[in-house]
């Protein structure tokens, strides 16, 4: 972490000393929280199963209340850990795109956490709403009333003043805002800044601390003091988190980090190139259409391919960024949270690129195989299909597991904790590696599609745009003048259907 400030000066020169100090403090605090939570989660997971079992010796009148208290304690520790990992990943980043890939989960998980705790609607069905309703019936003291009222007010006020972004959350978790969304929506995630995400973090943090302080006292009063003997007999249910997995990679960490970083940098350049193309070319098409009365609607296919290339670059950056978090962490809980994030990312990539049940709406249908129609697919495209089918067949990416990791509502986060402690690091890493390797092949396939579309457009325009001869005759006498020369040459290219070449000739005029 000590190298964060110097390594990130290239793209964070505007961060002031106070922000850097906060970042360093946050990194160190995050380490402490994750180390503590590594001990806390197994403890409260076992207690939760005890208080929800038939063997529980707690008085029936208080049993349900204890279940809610322990459940919320579990939730708070799990939720805060996964969003601390996002911040730490951003602080570790050596590339702007890598930093933003981690930062987007701060907003996403604050939304998921708040939605589960209090909700944007239907507050009575939320974790906190149900707890308060039960507590008001079962309480035998007024000691905690003030604290509980303050938390309820804080949750209400947060909902009224939140600076979270629901569209960003959808993009972070699904790579689209709505079903069949445009890949260009991902450009919204490129606007994320560490200042904004830290502001979101600091806005929500007081609520978390109020709740943690309150539940320490509630647990002592309603559970640990009256049932101390029973609680001490509870045995752990979750296995110890893997520490052996890190030994597998120990000798190759530097090599792995270097390879991942190079891939992030290459895909970041690809992302920027696609971004520039998607910004400039529609304006150029419009200008040429207006100037020369030429129909360039066919060129939209070329832009759609650029959208797909942009998305594939983003997928690769996202997956590589969480791999770096995993390989650079020495905290078992953080590594396993990174593995769960890998699972979410890989699930979403497979879904968007290929689809699980069918290919409808996938990039496979829209971009990769569309030009081939009933033709035999090239070997490179068949290889993409084989890799995707193999990943689906591995049964690593189930909807239940994904929902547990993404949506923090009741029962989901209990399952998520169980999944967290039963991750298969080698399988997750091998599958992630397979996806990272196949994404450039998908990009090559899309380039092949672009060439095919470009060829079709050229043939079409060469046939139907003979009218350009009239414009050529008009400006031929002036074709050697500086600006006219470029226009004349671009018209010659346009006549042959070489539209992209014509645009490139004109764009610097």
Give short role names for the model-derived ranges.
Residues 167-174, 400-407:
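Long, charged low-complexity segments
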Residues 1-163, 181-397, 412-509:
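Amphipathic alpha-helical interface segments
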């Amino acid at each position: 972490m000590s190298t964060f400030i110097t390594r990130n000066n290239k793209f964070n020169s505007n961060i002031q000393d106070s922000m850097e100090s906060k970042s360093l403090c946050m990194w160190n605090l995050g380490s402490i929280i994750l180390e503590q939570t590594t001990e806390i989660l197994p403890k409260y997971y076992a207690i939760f199963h005890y208080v929800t079992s038939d063997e529980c010796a707690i008085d029936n009148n208080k049993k349900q209340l204890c279940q809610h208290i322990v459940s919320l304690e579990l939730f708070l520790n799990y939720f805060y850990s996964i969003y601390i990992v996002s911040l730490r990943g951003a602080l570790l980043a050596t590339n702007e795109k890598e930093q933003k890939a981690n930062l987007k989960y701060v907003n996403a998980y604050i939304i998921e956490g708040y939605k589960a705790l209090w909700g944007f609607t239907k507050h009575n069905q939320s974790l906190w709403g149900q707890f308060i309703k039960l507590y008001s019936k079962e309480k035998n003291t007024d000691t905690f009333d003030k604290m509980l009222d303050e938390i309820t007010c804080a949750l209400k006020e947060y909902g009224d003043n939140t600076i979270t972004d629901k569209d960003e959350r959808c993009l972070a978790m699904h790579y689209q805002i709505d079903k069949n969304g445009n890949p260009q929506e991902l450009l919204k995630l490129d606007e994320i800044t560490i200042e904004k995400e830290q502001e979101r973090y600091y806005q929500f943090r007081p609520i978390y601390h109020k709740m943690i302080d309150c539940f320490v006292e509630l647990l002592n009063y309603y559970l640990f003091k009256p049932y101390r003997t029973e609680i001490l007999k509870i045995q752990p249910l979750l296995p110890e988190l893997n520490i052996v997995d890190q030994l597998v990679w120990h000798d190759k960490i530097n090599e792995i980090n270097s390879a991942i970083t190079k891939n992030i940098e290459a895909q970041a350049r690809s992302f920027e190139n696609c971004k520039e193309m998607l910004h400039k070319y529609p304006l150029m098409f419009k200008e040429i259409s207006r100037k020369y009365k030429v129909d360039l609607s066919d060129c939209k296919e070329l832009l759609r391919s650029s959208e797909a290339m942009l998305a594939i670059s983003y997928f690769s950056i996202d997956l590589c960024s969480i791999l770096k978090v995993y390989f650079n962490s020495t905290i078992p809980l953080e590594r396993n949270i990174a593995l769960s994030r890998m699972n979410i990312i890989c699930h979403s990539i497979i879904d968007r690129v290929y689809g699980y049940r069918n290919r409808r709406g996938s990039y496979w249908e829209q971009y990769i195989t569309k030009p081939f129609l009933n033709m035999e697919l090239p070997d490179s495209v068949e290889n993409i299909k084989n890799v995707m089918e193999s990943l689906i067949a591995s049964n690593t990416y189930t909807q239940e597991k994904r929902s547990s990791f993404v949506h923090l509502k009741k029962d989901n986060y209990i399952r998520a904790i169980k999944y967290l402690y039963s991750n298969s690091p080698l399988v997750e890493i091998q599958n992630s590696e397979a996806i990272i390797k196949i994404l450039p092949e998908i990009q090559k396939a899309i380039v092949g599609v672009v060439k095919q579309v470009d060829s079709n457009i050229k043939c079409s325009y060469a046939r139907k745009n003979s009218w350009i001869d009239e414009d050529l005759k008009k400006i031929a006498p002036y074709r050697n003048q500086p600006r006219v020369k470029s226009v004349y040459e671009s018209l010659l290219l346009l006549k042959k259907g070489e539209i992209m070449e014509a645009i490139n000739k004109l764009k610097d005029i």
